[in-house]
UniProtKB/Swiss-Prot annotation:
Protein name: 6,7-dimethyl-8-ribityllumazine synthase
PANTHER family on file: 6,7-DIMETHYL-8-RIBITYLLUMAZINE SYNTHASE, 6,7-DIMETHYL-8-RIBITYLLUMAZINE SYNTHASE DMRL SYNTHASE LUMAZINE SYNTHASE
Gene Ontology biological process terms in this record: riboflavin biosynthetic process
Entry similarity comment: Belongs to the DMRL synthase family.
Pfam families the record matches: DMRL_synthase
Gene: ribH
Organism: Mycobacterium ulcerans (strain Agy99)
Keywords annotated in UniProt: Riboflavin biosynthesis, Transferase
Function: Catalyzes the formation of 6,7-dimethyl-8-ribityllumazine by condensation of 5-amino-6-(D-ribitylamino)uracil with 3,4-dihydroxy-2-butanone 4-phosphate. This is the penultimate step in the biosynthesis of riboflavin.
Active site positions: 89 (proton donor)
Length: 160
């Protein structure tokens, strides 16, 4: 289910001191480019003008690149799209990417926001890509999640 139901309002925040990286796949270029644009816009609105951006071919490559990026960044955003086809490949890819990103985040204690769309159709992906005709912008949402989590972790670590 999607369409904007339940999406929290995220107040403006200053993340200007956060080192942000974005890794985005290139399959389904129109969708991935739109996700990346939304991520860049949210970063800029939060005080980050030049996040590190790395493009990879497909979704399966995202976790290992995200892992490397956590070494020198405070937050990482993963962007891509996997659209269900006629074979079980969709399920395998989605599972590997989701588990990989979660493991990277937990192992590195660095927020890695999962903005990899997993949809049943191209139409669903387009509707979440942040295009003018889209209901949602998952690139922007993932970036806000990564940055606000990085700020929360910074506060928690300062208290210890």
């Amino acid at each position: 289910m999607s369409g904007g139901a339940g999406i929290p309002d995220v107040p403006a925040f200053d993340a200007s001191g956060v080192r942000l990286a974005i890794v985005a796949s290139t399959w389904h270029t129109k969708i991935c480019d739109a996700l990346l644009a939304g991520a860049r816009n949210t970063a800029a609105d939060s005080g980050i003008d030049n996040p590190t951006v790395v493009r990879v071919l497909g979704a399966i490559e995202i976790p290992v690149v995200a892992q490397e990026l956590t070494r020198n960044h405070d937050a990482v955003v993963a962007l891509g799209v996997v659209i269900r086809g006629e074979t079980p490949h969709f399920d395998y890819v989605c599972d590997v990417v989701t588990q990989g990103l979660t493991r990277v985040s937990l192992d590195s204690s660095t927020p890695v926001a999962n903005g990899v769309l997993t949809t049943n159709s191209e139409e669903q992906a387009l509707n979440r890509a942040g295009l003018p005709t889209s209901d949602e912008d998952k690139g922007a949402q993932a970036t806000a999640a990564a940055l606000t989590t990085a700020l929360t972790l910074r506060e928690l670590r300062a208290e210890s």
